[in-house]
From Swiss-Prot:
Residues annotated for substrate binding in this entry: 67, 86-89, 183, 212
Catalytic activity: a myo-inositol phosphate + H2O = myo-inositol + phosphate
Keyword vocabulary terms for this entry: Chaperone, Cytoplasm, Hydrolase, Magnesium, Metal-binding, Ribosome biogenesis, RNA-binding, Transcription, Transcription antitermination, Transcription regulation
Keyword field contains Transferase: no
InterPro entries hit by this protein: IMPase, Inositol_monoP_metal-BS, Inositol_monophosphatase-like, Inositol_monophosphatase_CS, Inositol_monophosphatase_SuhB
Assembly: Homodimer. The rRNA transcription and antitermination complex (rrnTAC) consists of RNA polymerase (RNAP), NusA, NusB, NusE (rpsJ), NusG, SubB, ribosomal protein S4, DNA and precursor rRNA; S4 is more flexible than other subunits.
Top-level lineage group: Bacteria
Function, as annotated: Might be part of the processive rRNA transcription and antitermination complex (rrnTAC). The complex forms an RNA-chaperone ring around the RNA exit tunnel of RNA polymerase (RNAP). It supports rapid transcription and antitermination of rRNA operons, cotranscriptional rRNA folding, and annealing of distal rRNA regions to allow correct ribosome biogenesis. This subunit may play a central role in organizing the structure.
UniProt binding sites for Mg(2+): 67, 84, 86
Protein name (database record): Putative Nus factor SuhB
Enzyme class: hydrolase
Cellular component terms per the entry's GO annotation: cytoplasm
Database matches in Pfam families: Inositol_P
Length: 261
């Protein structure tokens, strides 16, 4: 584990321990609504404080971009962390174990390091550019399925911005007719990690934020998968529209999506 990932893991583990304690008494967790179907809790905020303080102490010249508190540090910094202190807040607030901490490091705008930590399962997904992806120190690879009708596809509903909902449901219906099934588990970082481990053969979602997908996308890429936007291009981090899959399935997924967008 390199120094960047070591720092990220230690911070994520501390934040995760706080989450586990909070999950034992959810009635005491204070929650606000940022928008329709978009919640933030004091657990999100406390996790972010732990992560930001650890990164600032270790790397005072790095920029840090967070879901809740925005940007910290110099805008022109060569290194930038993108972090989601609690991906899957709604799951967490309902006692569902599918939530995670997501941390990615960019150097001059290029993703270099990624860590996704799932506290309930104590699962640690990591990747370094050019060095592969790991789950709990074991190398992971995307699936090798070819036939779309045998594939399990992950997705996420556009519940915050519902302007895409009608179009999305048409796309989802098409996928359900042509695959072995679809799953909506409520935490994009873990959905992407499921692609990286082969539990999902592919994943697609619209209108996500950089902190939702930056870390998980690099983990997919380093596990042998491909990540694109809905047009098959590389603009997914900017647009928030993302498709991730094993190389044999990606084109088939893009064909379904392109028929409706």
């Amino acid at each position: 584990m390199n120094p960047f990932l070591n720092t990220a893991f230690k911070a994520a583990r501390r934040a995760g321990q706080m989450m586990i304690r909070a999950a034992g008494n959810l009635d005491a967790v204070k929650t606000d609504s940022k928008a329709f179907n978009d919640f933030v809790s004091d657990v999100d905020r406390n996790s972010e404080i732990i992560l930001v303080e650890a990164l600032k102490e270790a790397y005072p010249h790095h920029k840090i971009t967070c879901e809740e508190s925005g940007s910290h540090g110099k805008a022109a910094a060569e290194y930038e962390w993108i972090i989601d202190p609690l991906d899957g807040t709604t799951n967490f607030l309902h006692g569902h174990p599918q939530y995670a901490i997501s941390m990615a490091l960019l150097h001059k705008g290029v993703l270099q390091e990624a860590l996704v930590y799932a506290p309930e399962r104590n699962d640690v997904y990591m990747a370094s550019r050019g060095k592969g992806a790991l789950l709990n120190d074991r190398r992971i690879r995307v699936s090798n399925r070819i036939e779309l009708n045998r594939c399990l596809i992950g997705t996420g509903f556009p519940v915050v911005d519902q302007s895409m909902m009608d179009k999305y449901l048409v796309i989802l219906k098409d996928f359900l007719a042509k695959t072995a099934g679809g799953r909506r588990e409520g935490a994009a970082s873990l959905d992407l990690c499921a692609v990286a481990t082969g539990r999902f053969d592919g994943f697609f979602e619209f209108n996500l934020k950089p902190w939702d997908i930056a870390a998980g996308a690099l983990i997919v890429q380093e596990a042998g998968g491909i990540v694109t936007d809905m047009s098959g291009e590389d603009g997914w981090l900017e647009s928030g529209d993302i498709v991730a899959a094993n190389p044999k399935v990606l084109a088939q997924m893009l064909k379904i999506i392109s028929a409706h967008v």
